[in-house]
């Protein structure tokens, strides 16, 4: 099982951390602000 070999384990952990960091950055910069604007606009429209 290559997942338990230390070299592959470190490789899997490092790439997993890298992918997680990139996805977190992309979602916080591009995806979440759009949902925030949508939520704010819907709350303003519903309060009219």
From Swiss-Prot:
An annotated GO cellular component: proton-transporting ATP synthase complex
Signal peptide residues on this chain, from the entry's feature table: none
Membrane listed as a keyword: yes
Molecular function via GO: proton transmembrane transporter activity
Gene Ontology biological-process annotations: proton motive force-driven ATP synthesis; proton motive force-driven mitochondrial ATP synthesis
Superkingdom of the source species: Eukaryota
Transmembrane segment boundaries: 4-24
Keywords tagged on the record: ATP synthesis, CF(0), Hydrogen ion transport, Ion transport, Membrane, Mitochondrion, Transmembrane, Transmembrane helix, Transport
Membrane topology (UniProt): Single-pass membrane protein
Homology family: Belongs to the ATPase protein 8 family.
Protein function: Mitochondrial membrane ATP synthase (F(1)F(0) ATP synthase or Complex V) produces ATP from ADP in the presence of a proton gradient across the membrane which is generated by electron transport complexes of the respiratory chain. F-type ATPases consist of two structural domains, F(1) - containing the extramembraneous catalytic core and F(0) - containing the membrane proton channel, linked together by a central stalk and a peripheral stalk. During catalysis, ATP synthesis in the catalytic domain of F(1) is coupled via a rotary mechanism of the central stalk subunits to proton translocation.
Subunit structure: F-type ATPases have 2 components, CF(1) - the catalytic core - and CF(0) - the membrane proton channel.
Entry protein name: ATP synthase protein 8
Organism listed in the record: Schizosaccharomyces pombe (strain 972 / ATCC 24843)
């Amino acid at each position: 099982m290559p997942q338990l070999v230390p070299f592959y384990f470190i490789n899997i952990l490092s790439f997993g951390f890298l992918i997680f960091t990139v996805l977190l950055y992309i979602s916080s910069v591009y995806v979440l602000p759009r949902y925030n604007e949508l939520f704010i606009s819907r709350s303003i429209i519903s309060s009219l």
